[in-house]
Amino acid sequence: MIKRQHIVPEFFAEAEAMREALDACFKDAYNHKIHWQYFCDPRRYTYLRTTPQGVFPQAVLERFLQHLRQWCMQSLGLVPMGVPKLHLMVNGCRLGLHSDFHNGAWGYVYSLTRWQERRFSGGETLLMRDGIPSYKRHHAQDDSLYELIPAIFNQLLIFDDRIVHATPPIEGSMDPLEGRIALVGHIRASSPQVSGSLPPTVVRKVILDAMVQLRERVRTYKDVQGTVTYELTIGTTGTVESATSLTDNIITPATGYAHSDAVAAVRLITQQAMSGLKFPASMGRSTVIVPVLIPLPDLRPIEWVIAHNMPRGVLRTWAQSRLGSVAGLELQGAWEGEGETFVVREPVAGNIRIEAGQISACFDPPMWVPSQRENFQIALSAWLQSASASVDMEVDLPQQQCAPERGPARVNS
């Protein structure tokens, strides 16, 4: 079971192909331009970043992302959040001390740095140790306060996003070929993942009902927080044959990852709840990955309805061309039926329906901290509003069509 941090060496078989594509861009800057964002807040960070789609061959990048997702699901029971950013750090670049509690359950750094041949100092990932600062410890310095993890080529580092971390300043070359290069992103929970005989909608309903009860049982443990994921094996009778923890970063702020009676109690209650789930009987076994956020979040579904007076065919065409690339949503799924329902698998199960006179969206309650849910709702609302607004439709509408009025939105959030 993975806790706090974890390193996977030699992570991706095509790392050299990715690095060679990047080197080709650097060596021939006139013909292979990379549009970097100079990301600078002098108090906190200075580095360059870009999207990897314009750097790596599409097929290689897709295989990397698929491999990353598969590893995350098998090892953590969680999924990466969209496409990572490509970071470049040369002389003078740094990342100051910070934590990413609102970004995900885990952060990751996949290094494409030629670490063994580097001509700079700095550039490691600095992770503060638990219990820092402590006024009871005297003469503490260096590795007693933090851990430095080198950015070795083709290494995947994951760590608890709540850990205060940094990248020490780079001192050395300005040549990007000799810089610190990494893909950086975050990992979070998705809806329960189901394989086998049981219908996913039935499984999710059973789990959601159990979460409501679990929330009441752990409510008194106010200082316990984190995410634990379980891999459940369900027999043909519907009973849980095994409940295995894949990852567990449940802690208290006071104890960190050290022993805590409160954490142990919450783990036991949660394990018992997962082991005691009862599903319908089926023709074969099923496997379910279940993430649990402690404290339990808002368990109401995310629901939106917004009016429109567009022809459904026009609206459907518009939505199909734009839905998969909405920033902040990162929806993965497929259009079903007559192409009027987009069934979402990730990051949270749900659907978007284009109906006569209205667009409706309904998603399962995600196992995310409140700020992550809020950001998702804001992005979803913005997309639905743009879908109903004439200004975004004009390119698709025949000229004689009248522009629709924007309808009121209704939300249960």
Per-range role (PLM):
Residues 30-133, 162, 186, 288-299:
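Conserved double-stranded beta-helix
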Residues 300-329:
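Terminal, regulation- and interaction-focused segments at domain boundaries
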Residues 322-351:
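Ser/Thr-rich, low-complexity intrinsically disordered terminal regions
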Residues 372-402:
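A conserved amphipathic terminal alpha-helix motif
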Residues 346-381:
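Beta-strand/loop substructures that line and gate deep hydrophobic ligand-binding cavities in soluble
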Residues 121, 152-153:
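Short, flexible surface segments
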Residues 140, 144-146, 153-156, 162, ...:
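Charge-biased low-complexity segments
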